[in-house]
Amino acid sequence: MRTVVPFDPRDPKSRLAEFFADAEERRGFAYAMLADVLGAVRDAGGDPVVVATAPVSRPVDAPVTVDDRALSTAVAAAIADGPLPTAVVMADLALATPDAIRRVFAASGDVVLAPGSGGGTNVVLARTADVPVSYHGVSFRDHVTAAERAGLTVTTVDSFRLAADVDDASDLVDVFVHNTRRTREWLIAGGWRLAVDDGTPTVVREPND
C-alpha cells in the first residue's frame, strides 16, 4: 500500500531545542525516527513515499517529493493525486511497529484513523480521494466529524505504538523502553541513557570526558 510519510527537514523538533545541543542534532534525531518509520512501513507491506517540506540533506530509503505547502494541504494533495488506498503515517512515530501498521492496513472503512495521545491524528488511511484532512487543533475529532459529514465510514485503530509521537523530552523515555531500531541506537551513540531519579524515569546525557 502506498504510504505517505510527511517530513520537515528544515527545523525539526523545535520543542526539543533545550534537550539537544543544536538544530543539527535535532535534525539527526528526526532523520533517525524517519528511518524507523520507513522501515516499519516497509516491513508491514507498505510502499513508503516521503513528502518533505524541503530537499532532504541526508540519505533517505524511499522516494522523496518536495511540497512546501502546509501539512494539511500537502497531505490532501498526496491522497488526491496518488493511487488508492493511500495511508499517511507521521515521521515521528518512533515506537511504530510493522504489526501496528498492519492493523491499520487491514482495517475496514472508507477512512481509518489512528489517534495521537494529545488529540492529534498520527495515521490516516484513505480509500477514497475526497477524505477531508486537517491537522490543526484536535485533529482526530475533526477528522471523524468531517468524514462522517461527508458520508464516509470511519474506523479507529487504538494503538499505543501509533499514538506515541515524540514531541518533548518526556517522550524519550518511551523511546528507550520500546524502540528497538535506529532511534534508540542514535540516542545511545550520542551519549544519552535512561536513568531513574527518585523513582521517576528520565533520559540524561553522559558528560564528555
Swiss-Prot record:
NCBIfam families named in the record: F420_cofC
Give GO BP annotations, semicolon-separated: F420-0 metabolic process
Q: Which UniProt keywords apply?
A: GTP-binding, Nucleotide-binding, Nucleotidyltransferase, Transferase
Q: What is its EC number?
A: 2.7.7.68
Into which family does the record put it?
Belongs to the CofC family.
User: Does the entry feature the keyword Mitochondrion, yes or no?
Assistant: no
**Stated name of the protein:** 2-phospho-L-lactate guanylyltransferase
By its UniProt entry, which InterPro entries does this protein fall under? CofC, Nucleotide-diphossugar_trans
Q: Which reaction does it catalyse?
A: (2S)-2-phospholactate + GTP + H(+) = (2S)-lactyl-2-diphospho-5'-guanosine + diphosphate
Quaternary structure annotation from Swiss-Prot or TrEMBL: Homodimer.
Q: Which GO terms describe its molecular function?
A: GTP binding; phospholactate guanylyltransferase activity
Task of the protein:
Guanylyltransferase that catalyzes the activation of (2S)-2-phospholactate (2-PL) as (2S)-lactyl-2-diphospho-5'-guanosine, via the condensation of 2-PL with GTP. It is involved in the biosynthesis of coenzyme F420, a hydride carrier cofactor.
Identify the species of origin.
Answer: Halobacterium salinarum (strain ATCC 700922 / JCM 11081 / NRC-1)
Pathway involvement of the protein, from the record: Cofactor biosynthesis; coenzyme F420 biosynthesis
The record ties this protein, via Pfam families, to: CofC (PF01983)
Gene this protein is translated from: cofC
